[in-house]
Amino acid sequence: ALREQKSKADLAAMVSKANYRLLLAQDDNSVVGFSIVFVAGSESFCLLEYMAVDKSHRGGGVGSELFEQTIGAVHRSNVAIPILLEVDSDREPSPDQVQRRRRQNFYRRLGCRRIAGCTYILPLPGENAPPEMDLFVYVPGLAPTIRRGELEGWLKLIYRDVYGCSADDRRIAIMLDGVSDPIDLA
């Protein structure tokens, strides 16, 4: 969705911060993709904020390789910490429904799992409702469940450190309202 896209200036400011990692995918010295990852100060998890591959290079393994490189960059200094992903839901009627489904399937093929029962609320500026999102998680050898308290901690840090919202933002309670404990990964 266009509302969730950041400007070039916002992206540049983001990657200049110590808790962000930027990775580039190149082909013949041309950038054909990139990923930006936020690593929590506690290094207990990270958030894949952006991952994009040029349309002309999709379907050729560039995205899969970029994801693997991103995992390697995060896990190089940390032991297999969870990587969270904010992914457009494929359950919401949308003109880009096919693309949403492909994106979800892409991340599933790479080993990511959706956090069941959590309809993620992206804290976007403005009055309009944000697009319906799912929260995915990736950890090699991850158990089929996570604890509700763990998810709550991740959400509070994301809202505070990534989006500049209060860790007590009411939207966090709304997201947690539909999840069980332990939470299944779909």
What do these predicted ranges mean?
Residues 11-12, 71, 104:
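Short amphipathic alpha-helical segments and helix-helix/interface helices
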Residues 1-57:
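A conserved beta-strand-loop-helix scaffold within acyl/acetyltransferase catalytic domains
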Residues 75-186:
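Terminal substrate-recognition subdomain of acyl/acetyltransferases
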Residues 33, 61-63, 111:
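Glycine-centered flexibility sites
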Residues 48-53, 66, 106-107:
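Long, contiguous hydrophobic alpha-helical segments, chiefly transmembrane helices and signal peptides
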Residues 53, 59-76:
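Conserved acetyl-CoA-binding loop-helix of GNAT-fold acetyltransferases
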Residues 43, 61, 65, 98-102:
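Short, well-structured alpha-helical interface segments that form or flank functional binding sites
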